[in-house]
């Protein structure tokens, strides 16, 4: 991994990764990695096993760097799509638990998101009863409604239907244009109309 890479040249960064070294089991997936994430959306893209999810977990504080520092300010939203921590809770109970921790959400905004993603009828169901795609829609609704200083999303379009993919991409473009916090979104590729200026290509071969 190169010593220093900047996903964007401007505006000033809101989240910084400085000289981070980390890897599972003593290996070095990241070696002296430095990144500057500004306000808006930065896509972290790359193939299987390149470290996209590990980077998000480092930014969320779930993993601790062996060396280096990660600096950001304010609240952080991160929902691990592989976690079953909230499986027995309903979507509404999950939202309530996040609001208790992160602060109240705008009710009209939440209604707009649940309607846009087509999950209104599923809000009273336990998460374990939902399909993979519907469960991901619940997490995405929470991410957009929470309005955190830092929002971390892993594979936002996985298992989604086409209308939902378009809706999520539209909402990501909106928060990017308005500079609403730092958003780091990991996926294999970024869809149109995102450009290279919005993308950091994470590649273990670099």
Regions found by a protein language model. Name each.
Residues 1-39, 63-64:
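A short, flexible loop at the N-terminus of ABC-type nucleotide-binding domains that lies
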Residues 46, 54-100, 190-192, 206:
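ABC ATPase nucleotide-binding domain signature region
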Residues 108-122:
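Conserved ABC ATPase "signature" region
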Residues 126-133:
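Conserved ABC ATPase signature
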Residues 140:
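Hydrophobic anchor residue at the start of the ABC signature
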Residues 144-145:
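ABC ATPase C-loop
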Residues 154, 160-161, 165:
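ABC-family nucleotide-binding domains
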Residues 163, 171-193:
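Conserved catalytic loops of ABC-family nucleotide-binding domains
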């Amino acid at each position: 991994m190169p010593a220093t890479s900047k996903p964007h040249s401007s505006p000033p960064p809101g989240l910084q990764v400085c000289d981070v070294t980390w890897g599972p089991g003593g290996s070095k997936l990241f070696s002296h990695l430095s990144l500057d994430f500004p306000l808006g959306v930065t896509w972290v893209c790359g193939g299987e096993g390149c470290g996209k999810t590990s980077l998000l977990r480092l930014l969320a504080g779930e993993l601790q760097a062996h060396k280096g520092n990660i600096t950001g300010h304010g609240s952080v939203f991160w929902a691990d799509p592989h976690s079953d921590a909230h499986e027995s809770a309903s979507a509404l109970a999950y939202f309530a638990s996040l609001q208790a921790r992160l602060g109240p959400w705008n009710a009209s905004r939440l209604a707009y998101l649940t309607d846009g993603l087509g999950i209104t009828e599923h809000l009273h169901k336990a998460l374990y009863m939902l399909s993979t795609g519907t469960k991901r829609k619940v997490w995405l609704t929470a991410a957009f409604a929470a309005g955190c200083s830092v929002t971390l999303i892993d594979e936002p379009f996985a298992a989604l239907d086409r209308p939902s993919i378009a809706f999520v991409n539209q909402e990501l473009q909106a928060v990017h244009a308005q500079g609403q916090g730092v958003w780091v979104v990991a996926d294999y590729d970024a869809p149109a109309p995102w450009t290279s200026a919005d993308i950091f290509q994470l590649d273990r071969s670099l």
